[in-house]
Design a protein with these regions (language model features):
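His/acidic metal-ligating clusters that form di-metal
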Residues: 4-82, 119
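Binuclear metal-dependent phosphoesterase catalytic core
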Residues: 55, 77-127
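Oxyanion-hole/transition-state-stabilizing segment in secreted/luminal serine hydrolases
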Residues: 1
Length: 127
């Protein structure tokens, strides 16, 4: 499925080597989400997400994983790591609607504020 992302083995090794040497709180940014969203949106997430999560969960320093691609706002925590995706600027989807049905009025972006040990994510709606 061309809509699904895959991290190749060489890149996964590079990520692993980098993650294992972290000494500071870290934000990881991906294109495809590394967590299940639900419904038809799960066809658009990172295919080898379990291996990716296994690597980043090894580090005590990864605080959050940001992603896009699905044009839907999500914000969840799994095993101590926060995962968040952004809505789309031009159009937004919802895992609760039919495949590729546009969710009118959900367009927007995320405003991320980092203060010491806090990461605040505010979804900003376009109206």
């Amino acid at each position: 499925n061309r809509s699904r992302g895959v991290i190749d083995i060489d890149t996964m090794i590079k990520i692993k080597n980098k993650i294992y040497t972290l000494k500071k709180p870290t934000i990881v940014v991906l294109h495809h989400p590394a967590l299940e969203i639900g419904g038809w949106q799960d066809l658009k997430i990172l295919k080898n997400r379990d291996k990716f999560r296994e690597i980043i969960e090894y580090s005590e320093y990864v605080r959050i994983v940001l992603a896009g691609h699905i044009h839907e706002f999500t914000d969840r925590t799994l095993n101590g790591i926060r995962y968040s995706t952004a809505p789309g600027l031009g159009f937004a989807f919802s895992s609760k609607l039919s495949n590729y049905e546009i969710q009118h009025g959900a367009e927007g972006f995320n405003l991320i504020t980092i203060n010491k040990n806090k990461i605040l994510i505010n979804k900003i709606a376009l109206k």
